[in-house]
């Protein structure tokens, strides 16, 4: 019995519209979305293949820990032939948000996309139901508008990712964006734009089976308290805290949570971010007061809470309420 893995991948041919499901057990020994994708590339995408060729692949992949609740395991890997780098080497773009975990909850470890669509489309996945949907209405729109439209069309339970006009026009360093992150450079946006693939909308209601849930919880708590929570020269508070040996001499970094720094519009009343001792795993998420790092004290007046990517305690995003 396989643990961690969902056990199958999707293959989507945009030229023909064919969508099939494939068992992926033979890729498990390569561990993770990147390893699986590189093996598929090795088998199916010759080095001389141009990134804009119809046979060029774009592979979305997640690993066995994705969706299992292990800290910092929620990212999705996207492997393709770079439109940016010299020689169009095979490259990876990693992205956060919640879409990687949602892909696993939908029952898939990856999506292998080939072909070129005649018209703009997006890939819709809802558990076992997979379809290519018309994206003509959002072709030409930016990523915020496109992601918003896909959510409105499908429901708030869906996680979405979209390219923008840069990708559509084959800008060779364009990206794919979700609500909580982006794919970085190397031209994933252009690779998808060439295929007329505007984006993804995914909803999954499944779960990830692990061999020993108790051990996974122990490992996760160790990572939270001893590794992520550990105080060292690469991870120190912006302001002195009573438990911490060091703090940032500049007084300014993303670890800006500190006594007196508030989320003043938090539901139920203001929340003082306070101190975050290394061994209190319930306070790790209070550390990264990104709004305070960006805008200083005025940010606290409008902060609702910190947000972030799936399974990540670092919480890089600040949610604001700017209504009077």
Label each residue range with its predicted role.
Residues 1-94, 98-324:
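Intrinsically disordered, low-complexity segments enriched in small residues
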């Amino acid at each position: 019995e396989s643990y961690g893995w969902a056990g199958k991948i999707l293959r989507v041919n945009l030229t023909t519209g064919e969508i099939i499901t494939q068992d992926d057990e033979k890729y498990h020994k390569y561990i993770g979305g990147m390893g699986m994708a590189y093996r598929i590339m090795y088998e199916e995408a010759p080095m001389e293949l141009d990134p804009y060729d119809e046979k060029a692949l774009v592979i979305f992949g997640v690993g066995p820990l994705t969706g299992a609740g292990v800290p910092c395991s929620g990212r999705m890997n996207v492997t393709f032939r770079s439109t940016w780098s010299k020689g169009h080497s095979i490259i990876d773009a990693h992205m956060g948000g919640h879409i990687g975990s949602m892909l696993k909850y939908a029952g898939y470890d990856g999506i292998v996309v080939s072909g070129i669509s005649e018209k703009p489309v997006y890939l819709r996945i809802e558990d076992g139901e997979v379809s290519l949907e018309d994206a003509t209405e959002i072709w030409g729109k930016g990523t915020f508008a496109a992601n918003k439209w896909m959510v409105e069309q499908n429901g708030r339970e869906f996680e979405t990712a979209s390219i923008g006009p840069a990708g559509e026009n084959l800008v060779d360093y364009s990206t794919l964006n979700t609500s909580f992150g982006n794919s970085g450079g190397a031209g994933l946006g252009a690779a998808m734009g060439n295929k007329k693939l505007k984006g993804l909308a995914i909803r999954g209601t499944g779960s990830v089976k692990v061999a020993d849930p108790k051990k996974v919880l122990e490992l996760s708590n160790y990572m939270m308290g001893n590794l992520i929570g550990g105080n060292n020269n690469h991870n120190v508070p912006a302001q002195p805290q009573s438990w911490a040996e060091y703090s940032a001499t500049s007084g300014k970094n993303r670890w800006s949570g500190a006594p007196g720094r508030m989320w003043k519009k938090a539901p139920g009343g203001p929340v003082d971010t306070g101190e975050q001792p290394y061994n209190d795993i319930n306070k790790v998420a209070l550390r990264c007061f990104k709004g305070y790092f960006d805008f200083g004290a005025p940010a606290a007046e409008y902060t609702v809470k910190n947000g972030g990517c799936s399974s990540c305690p670092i919480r890089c995003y600040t949610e604001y309420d700017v209504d009077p």
